[in-house]
Design a protein with these regions (language model features):
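Active-site-proximal alpha-helical scaffold in enzymes
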Residues: 1-20, 28, 84-113, 171-178, ...
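Beta-strand segments within the central parallel beta-sheet cores of soluble alpha/beta enzyme folds
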Residues: 14-19, 95-100, 118-123, 185-196, ...
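Active-site pocket-shaping loop/turn-to-helix segments
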Residues: 23, 30-31, 67-75, 85, ...
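Short, well-ordered amphipathic alpha-helical segments that serve as non-catalytic structural scaffolds
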Residues: 1, 76-83, 99-104, 175-179, ...
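Flexible glycine-/small-residue-enriched beta->alpha junction loops
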Residues: 13-82
Length: 270
């Protein structure tokens, strides 16, 4: 929003911030279908279809191909299981990617990389919070592989290969080149282009497959021009699946870990 406001000439410097307190949600509240009185009745068939898939399993197909509405109220974990069905990705592949995320995050933390992003917070009792508490040091494939599926009895998505519920806050200053030069500020990064694309909400995690090429086209760049890619790890299946679909080598993807370890505070991620 800050970038587009600057581009539209509405201002030249903004503080862009977000905050999330997912720990305040009732258990399951953030991943539950709305009550009958809240759900648009037009989506009743779509919600019933998701419920059948969750209970019985089966291959996912895009309902739009038959003229049906997609499930706009679908739980995020069910979208991950749909992606798994669509791609045929094994449980082991997902678990290996999740362990990679945890291990790379631990390595980057030990090297002091993540401390560059953290402003210490002093609590009223004097406690200093200066590190993320979500990453699990020493995560192994053996440990992750023992976890049970969460969303479907015969599924592959577990607490180990998904992002955790997290609290978090972030803020940064976004300004125009002209304003930065006027103030003598050297930018840490530049926004070259952005893109928004759409797909069925029932496989929401595959959005990078269309959005990344669109952003590159807008910038006059190609995949080979990019040294490092960051794809949010809501679930291992969608992050790894998107990378595979785009032909992104693992040595260019989330090289310091990702949301499976760090967390995915919805209101601040990004």
């Amino acid at each position: 929003m800050a970038f587009h406001a600057i581009r539209a000439g509405e201002g030249d410097a903004y503080i862009s911030a977000g905050v999330e307190a997912a720990s305040g949600f009732a258990r399951g509240h953030s991943d539950a279908s709305p009550g009958q009185n809240l759900a648009n009745p037009r989506f009743a068939d779509a919600m019933a279809r998701t419920a059948r898939l969750a209970a019985e399993g089966g291959a996912w197909t895009d309902p739009r191909e038959s003229g049906a509405l997609p499930d706009a109220y679908i739980a995020m974990g069910q979208t991950a299981e749909n992606v798994q069905q669509m791609l045929g990705m094994s449980r082991r592949e997902q678990d290996e990617f999740a362990v990679r995320s945890q291990n790379l995050t631990e390595k980057a933390k030990d090297a002091g990389f993540w401390s560059l992003d953290i402003t210490p917070v002093v609590l009223p009792d004097g406690t200093v919070v200066d590190a993320d508490d979500s990453p699990r040091a020493g995560t192994t494939l053996e440990g992750v592989s023992q976890l049970q599926p969460v969303f479907r009895e015969s599924g592959t998505v577990t607490a180990g290969n998904s992002c955790p519920m997290s609290d978090g806050a972030a803020a940064l200053v976004v300004m125009s080149d002209a304003r930065a030069k006027e103030l003598g500020i050297t930018p840490l990064a530049r926004i070259v282009s952005t893109a928004v694309t759409g797909l069925s909400p029932e496989i929401m995690g595959m959005g990078p497959v269309s959005a990344i090429p669109a952003a590159l086209r807008a910038a006059g760049l190609t995949m080979s021009d990019i040294d490092l890619f960051e794809i949010n790890e809501a679930f291992a299946v969608q992050a790894l699946g998107s990378a595979q679909a785009l032909g992104i080598d693992m040595d260019r993807l989330n090289v310091n870990g990702g949301a499976i370890a760090l967390g995915h505070p919805f209101g601040m991620t990004g």
